[in-house]
Amino acid sequence: GLNDLPAVIRADVGISVENATEAVRESANVILMKKDLNVLEEGVLEGREAFANMLKYIKITATSNFGNICAIVAASVLLPFFPMTSIQLLLLNLLYDILCLILPWDHVDADLLTKPLEWSGRTLGKFMTFFGPVSSLFDLLTFVFLYFVLCPGVCGGSFGSLSAEKQSLFISMFQTGWFLESMWTQVLILQLLRTKQLPLIQSRPGRMVTGVTILGIVLFTLLPVTPVGKMLGMTAMPPVYFLFLVIDVIAYLLLVTLAKAFYIKKNQDLI
């Protein structure tokens, strides 16, 4: 009633019910459609869950982009060609963005819901500059393998000694190799950094996140052997490349896991 109006106005969060007087409803921040305070708890938890998933997206995406930018800058200086075409980069980002679009349906660890999370640009910068170079390190390792081992072995010599036709194959194979490595690491790092616990064991992602992750990896791994892949300048990779890819990705995930444990120990939290 009207006797509650002063209290509702002075409260940090004024709460009213649907059938209250018009003045009280207009002054309230929250209007309950039914007389049940459990609705407030559910709303708070939903808000914290949405905010936690938003923080995951921002921090992990910024980290991935930072690592890729560092690798592209280094490759542009050291290599006689671009490490990836612009359309390939856009396609890679499209896959990653599609995967991130389903993050709102991801599971959130219970410890993230016990208290409100805070947004801080300082922690974003710390997170990005800590994990980003790890990604760049394995990108550079992939560059070395592709430029000095795989591509010369398949094409029959170093890049400068090849004919124009062989150089075109060299470039296509290099770009395809880095595209696949970047896709695998970007997609899987999302699984590692979405939780401070052991992923897939102590903290399982939502079914939709898992499904899109697996589907994206399968489709984009097969892309180079399809007509669409050839239109994008890609080429089929030899079996030895996939052996390297598996070893590279496993080593990357292990190093990120160790780095994550160190980061949590130093900062008491991940997200």
Question: Predicted regions span which residues?
Answer:
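Membrane-embedded transport module
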Residues: 1, 11, 16-198
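Conserved cytosolic catalytic loops of P-type ATPases
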Residues: 4-5
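Basic, alpha-helical nucleic-acid-binding regions used in initiation and control of genome expression
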Residues: 8
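C-terminal transmembrane module of polytopic membrane proteins
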Residues: 93, 147-151, 155, 169-271
